[in-house]
């Protein structure tokens, strides 16, 4: 499903991950382990299209997505819940969840929302609350829930 071939990525002249290869198969769970600054998050952000790919290939399914912008990678089925959460803090929980539907339109918004609320029932109690007023744990649930609204393959 996902294959990284000799991937190198980073920020401008800074190389965060160098010559990294990995093959993930459908239905498996994989953890990237390493010390702080080893490039784990940068690698994931590179796969999602948010960090510059400096060399190598990113294969997703049968498609080389190495040169696709982040928006096209979302359409291909890749979603990420970044460490900084990147919520719209002045929008409600409901509106933050709806953003996922805007990026990746779905005629089944209510079904997608209900699936997220089944996973995170606390969010259902806070639908009208502003994201900025949620606890840290609730914000993390919302960030993950928003990514899941995209029905990602990865």
Task: Describe each PLM feature range.
Residues 130-134, 138:
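Conserved ABC ATPase signature
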Residues 33-35:
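The feature captures the beta-strand-to-loop junction immediately N-terminal to the Walker
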Residues 151:
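Conserved catalytic motifs of ABC-family nucleotide-binding domains
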Residues 12, 30, 68, 93-111, ...:
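ABC-type ATPase nucleotide-binding domains, specifically the catalytic core motifs of the NBD
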Residues 56-63, 76, 109-113:
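Conserved ABC transporter NBD signature motif
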Residues 147-148:
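ABC ATPase C-loop
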Residues 48:
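Helix-to-loop junction immediately C-terminal to a conserved catalytic motif
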């Amino acid at each position: 499903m996902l294959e990284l071939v000799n991937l190198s990525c980073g920020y401008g002249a800074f190389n965060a991950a160098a010559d990294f290869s990995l093959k993930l198969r459908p239905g498996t769970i994989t953890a990237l382990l390493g010390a702080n600054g080893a490039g784990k998050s940068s690698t994931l952000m590179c796969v999602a299209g948010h960090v510059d790919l400096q060399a190598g290939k990113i294969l997703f399914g049968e498609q080389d997505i190495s040169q696709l912008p982040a928006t096209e990678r979302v359409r291909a089925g890749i979603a990420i819940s970044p460490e900084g959460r990147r919520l719209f803090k002045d929008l409600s929980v409901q509106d933050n969840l709806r953003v996922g539907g805007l990026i990746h339109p779905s005629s089944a918004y209510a079904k997608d929302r209900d699936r997220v609320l089944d996973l995170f029932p606390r969010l259902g109690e806070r639908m009208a609350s502003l994201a900025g007023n949620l606890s840290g744990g609730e914000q993390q649930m919302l960030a993950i829930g928003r990514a899941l609204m995209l029905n990602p393959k990865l």
